[in-house]
């Protein structure tokens, strides 16, 4: 690792600790040339799969788009920000766990519905009605009946 003070290549690690619930390593380093100390953080590069849209187009995973859909469904519902963050994190972990480089958008929608079903049934119905393009009240009733089973 290059020293940020003198740009020398030789540095040594003085101390290493896990931080961010074990998702990062904090390293205290010292330059062997100028003796300055500095801190680095190391974390895994987590690459999200590309999304295959229903029309066949491929695009990068857009977390903001997913979060927006979840937040719209949960608008004015009694669900904490922490619970929402955990649901988003769970969905992203499930997507990475597939090991696939590309996933269909339908899979993402189903994962979102699964999390919403656990968080809040009303939000689930809201999301499902848009995602599945409900045409009439009968479709709402059928989906609600499935929830009651």
Swiss-Prot record:
A zinc finger (unnamed) spans 3-34. The keyword Hydrolase does not apply. It comes from the Bacteria. Coiled coil: none annotated. Keywords: ATP-binding, DNA-binding, Metal-binding, Nucleotide-binding, Repressor, Transcription, Transcription regulation, Zinc, Zinc-finger. One of its GO terms (biological process) is negative regulation of DNA-templated transcription. GO terms for molecular function: ATP binding; DNA binding; zinc ion binding. InterPro entries: ATP-cone_dom (IPR005144), NrdR-like_N (IPR055173), RNR_NrdR-like (IPR003796). Its cofactor is Zn(2+). Binds 1 zinc ion. Residues 49-139 form the ATP-cone domain. The keyword Repressor applies. Belongs to the NrdR family. Negatively regulates transcription of bacterial ribonucleotide reductase nrd genes and operons by binding to NrdR-boxes. This is Transcriptional repressor NrdR. It comes from Vibrio atlanticus (strain LGP32) (Vibrio splendidus (strain Mel32)).
């Amino acid at each position: 690792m290059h020293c940020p003070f003198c740009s020398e290549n030789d540095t040594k690690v003085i101390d290493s600790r896990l931080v961010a619930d074990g998702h990062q390593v904090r390293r205290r380093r010292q330059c062997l040339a100028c003796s300055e100390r500095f801190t680095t953080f190391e974390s895994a590069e987590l690459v999200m799969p590309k999304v295959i849209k229903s029309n066949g187009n491929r695009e990068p995973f857009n977390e903001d788009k997913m979060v927006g859909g979840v937040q719209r469904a949960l608008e004015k519902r009694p669900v904490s920000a922490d619970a929402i963050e955990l649901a988003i994190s769970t969905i992203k972990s499930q997507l990475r766990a597939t090991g696939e480089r590309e996933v269909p958008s339908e899979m993402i929608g189903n994962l979102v519905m699964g999390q919403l079903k656990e968080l809040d049934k009303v939000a689930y119905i809201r999301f499902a009605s848009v995602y599945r393009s409900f045409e009439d009240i009968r479709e709402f009733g059928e989906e609600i009946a499935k929830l009651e089973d």
